[in-house]
């Protein structure tokens, strides 16, 4: 895939993938995060032809940081308080749209967009609770 086409596809749907990558890295490193996303598409860990659908969250986080052990549990939620402060990729829904952000201790830790209408006007609906441990 050409780089500009990949960028367009990533801009439309890589929010969950970026949340997993950010969780594994522990901080935002844009050029590294984009490189990991590219490698993940090359390895079929994400599907760039399906809104950057994450085929394997654990493999994606291991690609970002192989020195940790990861687990992910999906949970339906209606508020951030239900997460008890845990690290999670949370989907906010607004109308027919949704957007994932990384949340910890009830606060948004990372949002791949500057101004998400889903987060601003929507409600949290699902969470991917992320556990990270040393190997």
Per-segment meaning from a language model:
Residues 1-47:
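Active-site nucleophile-adjacent alpha helix/oxyanion-hole segment immediately C-terminal to the catalytic cysteine
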């Amino acid at each position: 895939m050409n780089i500009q086409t990949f960028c367009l596809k990533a801009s439309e749907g890589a929010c969950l993938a970026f949340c997993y990558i950010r969780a594994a890295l522990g901080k935002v490193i844009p050029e590294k995060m984009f490189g990991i996303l590219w490698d993940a598409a090359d390895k079929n860990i994400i599907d760039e032809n399906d809104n950057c659908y994450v085929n394997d969250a654990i493999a994606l986080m291991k690609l970002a940081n192989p020195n940790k052990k990861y687990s992910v549990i999906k949970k339906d939620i209606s508020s951030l308080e239900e997460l008890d402060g845990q690290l999670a990729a949370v989907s906010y829904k607004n109308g027919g749209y949704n957007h994932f952000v990384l949340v910890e201790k009830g606060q948004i830790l990372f949002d791949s967009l500057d101004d998400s209408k889903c987060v601003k006007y929507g409600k949290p609906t699902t969470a991917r609770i992320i556990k990270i441990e040393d190997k």
